[in-house]
Amino acid sequence: MARAKTVKRDSVTHIYQTCKQAGTCPPDVINKVEQTTVADNILKYGSAGVFFGGLGISTGRGTGGATGYVPLGEGPGVRVGGTPTVVRPSLVPETIGPVDILPIDTVNPVEPTASSVVPLTESTGADLLPGEVETIAEIHPVPEGPSVDTPVVTTSTGSSAVLEVAPEPIPPTRVRVSRTQYHNPSFQIITESTPAQGESSLADHVLVTSGSGGQRIGGDITDIIELEEIPSRYTFEIEEPTPPRRSSTPLPRNQSVGRRRGFSLTNRRLVQQVQVDNPLFLTQPSKLVRFAFDNPVFEEEVTNIFENDLDVFEEPPDRDFLDVRELGRPQYSTTPAGYVRVSRLGTRATIRTRSGAQIGSQVHFYRDLSSINTEDPIELQLLGQHSGDATIVHGPVESTFIDMDISENPLSESIEAYSHDLLLDETVEDFSGSQLVIGNRRSTNSYTVPRFETTRNGSYYTQDTKGYYVAYPESRNNAEIIYPTPDIPVVIIHPHDSTGDFYLHPSLHRRKRKRKYL
């Protein structure tokens, strides 16, 4: 009998890949591949509570961590009476890197006898503002020009000699001017010149004023030259008449139809004329033809077509729009009287033939609004920066100069130069026929306060905010009535009772009953 041949089992990874989708994997294959064996679970859950990272396990060093290995049963590596010894394997320590030795230098050594109290000094705060800007001016030497040989003249007369020395030639000088301008965004100036006297520039802000402009009395007479004012480019007006309006955005179809002879919206022979007084004709004319819902989004600026069934009669909201099938777009024009007219051309569907054709007349619905007037020219203002806003006033120019001789005094010849008669008022006031009016005549109101006979003095307050209220004091001699105020309760006494007994209230009497005696 032949022995069966042993077939080697396939690898666990290949078996897991083929049997995982079919779900026929053996349990040992699943546990090994997914690492769910007993050993894997011990390592997985045990590592959560115990940490062996500092012992150097599986690192190949075997140093036993920072404290080394300690023999079992001996406790820590400390012996009584001696120095503690640490058992380490004989391994060469690894060199991490060179150690840099930094020398420590004492800048200000402190002596032992010095005081330990550190004195405090006042220090100025940090200067946040920029300091003075240092300006350096470079002086370039003047280049030497061509040398000029000046002859030396010697004059000898007799025994003395005179030496004439010619002056040194002055070389030409060169001047260079540098300029720096800083931009300040918070400062705005006028970018164009002012039409009045004075001029404002962009860089230096130089104010230029003329030397004349005032009035001088008693001076020299000069010739007056007639000058012509030069208008500025901003001082002009445009006055154009408004062209007459005939219509607003007419359709080409209306223009072609209007060329036909005899056809017009106002032709009473071909088009029925209906004047509409309802204001809905301007905004929502469809509500005059049929009852419908209001749609605020829809603007009825187009032609409206209404499909009505002639078998079913519907009364329109407005009787003038009966049987209207089509209502055209609005047309704007002017009447001979100068009013604005809003017109709509409508078509009625009065008769319908057997073939389905609808026959009706054309109706011209219109409403006159107002007249068209020519607009007055409006003075427009320029946008942005422009000149003419600022006014520059120069004091000496606006003053008046009077030439007079101070040495002459016309009042010096008069004896009574400062007479008090000059202060008297010679006007005579006449009050004949005058009338004295107190208060304001336009707001004269009469108030009547009633008087009541009461035992108390009444106080009345009349509110008067328009005129004057005059109160006249009055004195009255009325006898004062004093009413008694008893402190004990009121007792009713009946003098006709002679029994001397008390008075019993009827409600306290005993009721009489009929009793039967046996």
From Swiss-Prot:
<feature type="disulfide bond">
    <location>
        <begin position="19"/>
        <end position="25"/>
    </location>
</feature>
<feature type="short sequence motif" description="Nuclear localization signal">
    <location>
        <begin position="510"/>
        <end position="517"/>
    </location>
</feature>
<keyword id="KW-0945">Host-virus interaction</keyword>
<keyword id="KW-1048">Host nucleus</keyword>
<keyword id="KW-1040">Host Golgi apparatus</keyword>
<dbReference type="GO" id="GO:0043657">
    <property type="term" value="C:host cell"/>
</dbReference>
<keyword id="KW-0597">Phosphoprotein</keyword>
<keyword id="KW-1163">Viral penetration into host nucleus</keyword>
<protein>
    <recommendedName>
        <fullName>Minor capsid protein L2</fullName>
    </recommendedName>
</protein>
<keyword id="KW-0426">Late protein</keyword>
<dbReference type="GO" id="GO:0003677">
    <property type="term" value="F:DNA binding"/>
</dbReference>
<keyword id="KW-0946">Virion</keyword>
<keyword id="KW-1177">Microtubular inwards viral transport</keyword>
<feature type="region of interest" description="Disordered">
    <location>
        <begin position="237"/>
        <end position="262"/>
    </location>
</feature>
<dbReference type="Pfam" id="PF00513">
    <property type="entry name" value="Late_protein_L2"/>
</dbReference>
<dbReference type="GO" id="GO:0044174">
    <property type="term" value="C:host cell endosome"/>
</dbReference>
<keyword id="KW-1039">Host endosome</keyword>
<keyword id="KW-0167">Capsid protein</keyword>
<comment type="function">
    <text>Minor protein of the capsid that localizes along the inner surface of the virion, within the central cavities beneath the L1 pentamers. Plays a role in capsid stabilization through interaction with the major capsid protein L1. Once the virion enters the host cell, L2 escorts the genomic DNA into the nucleus by promoting escape from the endosomal compartments and traffic through the host Golgi network.</text>
</comment>
<feature type="short sequence motif" description="Nuclear localization signal">
    <location>
        <begin position="1"/>
        <end position="10"/>
    </location>
</feature>
<comment type="similarity">
    <text>Belongs to the papillomaviridae L2 protein family.</text>
</comment>
<keyword id="KW-0238">DNA-binding</keyword>
<keyword id="KW-1176">Cytoplasmic inwards viral transport</keyword>
<keyword id="KW-1015">Disulfide bond</keyword>
<dbReference type="GO" id="GO:0075521">
    <property type="term" value="P:microtubule-dependent intracellular transport of viral material towards nucleus"/>
</dbReference>
<dbReference type="GO" id="GO:0044177">
    <property type="term" value="C:host cell Golgi apparatus"/>
</dbReference>
<dbReference type="InterPro" id="IPR000784">
    <property type="entry name" value="Late_L2"/>
</dbReference>
<keyword id="KW-1160">Virus entry into host cell</keyword>
<dbReference type="GO" id="GO:0042025">
    <property type="term" value="C:host cell nucleus"/>
</dbReference>
<dbReference type="GO" id="GO:0075732">
    <property type="term" value="P:viral penetration into host nucleus"/>
</dbReference>
<dbReference type="GO" id="GO:0005198">
    <property type="term" value="F:structural molecule activity"/>
</dbReference>
<dbReference type="GO" id="GO:0019028">
    <property type="term" value="C:viral capsid"/>
</dbReference>
<comment type="subunit">
    <text>Interacts with major capsid protein L1. Interacts with E2; this interaction inhibits E2 transcriptional activity but not the DNA replication function E2. Interacts with host GADD45GIP1. Interacts with host HSPA8; this interaction is required for L2 nuclear translocation. Interacts with host importins KPNB2 and KPNB3. Forms a complex with importin alpha2-beta1 heterodimers via interaction with the importin alpha2 adapter. Interacts with host DYNLT1; this interaction is essential for virus intracellular transport during entry.</text>
</comment>
<dbReference type="GO" id="GO:0046718">
    <property type="term" value="P:symbiont entry into host cell"/>
</dbReference>
